[in-house]
Swiss-Prot record:
Keywords: Cytoplasm, RNA-binding
Entries under HAMAP family matching the protein: SmpB (MF_00023)
Domain of life: Bacteria
Protein known as: SsrA-binding protein
Native source species: Bartonella quintana (strain Toulouse) (Rochalimaea quintana)
């Protein structure tokens, strides 16, 4: 008998947690990545870092810059450059929308998550973001501390 499939599972490889603290997220989008074979193998073993990376437009295409996917140890001479530029697959309409948005001052494209979708394809969640000022970061930290304190008080007295 066939088993019923459960809810789709997204295997998260890398999460850019600092981006949510350092940037005000305005819009999200899921894009595909153009990868080499050894890069996919390396990602399947959960090795990647997107904390210092960003997306930029060059020659009418969207590229992921400064992402780190380490070399796959069994790939010998067919290995890849760990910090190479990786092309992002995005529709023309979305590309135009994001290009117009990033041409405004202070807007940038930051990666939030790198994961495998239900079909086993490597996907990247990018966000249109605006950098936070120092006082905005302090405000975020105060809100987070208050939420924790409120939960602690409710647990103790409520």
């Amino acid at each position: 008998m066939n088993k019923k499939r459960n809810a789709p599972v997204r295997k998260i490889i890398a999460d850019n947690r600092k981006a949510r603290f350092n940037f005000e997220i305005l819009d999200n989008l899921e894009v595909g990545l153009v990868l080499q074979g050894a890069e996919v193998k390396s990602l399947r073993s959960n090795h990647a870092n997107i904390a210092e990376s960003y997306a930029s437009f060059e020659n009418g295409e969207l590229w992921l810059v400064n992402s780190y996917i380490p070399e796959y140890t069994q790939a010998n001479r067919f290995n890849h450059e760990p910090r190479r530029l990786r092309k992002l697959l995005i529709s023309k309409r979305e590309m135009a929308r994001f290009f117009n948005a990033t041409s405004r001052e202070g807007m940038t494209l930051v990666p939030l998550k790198l994961y495998f979708n239900e079909r086993g394809r490597a996907k990247l969640e990018i966000a249109l973001a605006r950098g936070k000022k120092l006082h905005d970061k302090r405000e975020t930290e105060k809100k987070r501390d208050w939420r924790c304190e409120k939960a602690r008080l409710l647990k103790r007295y409520g």
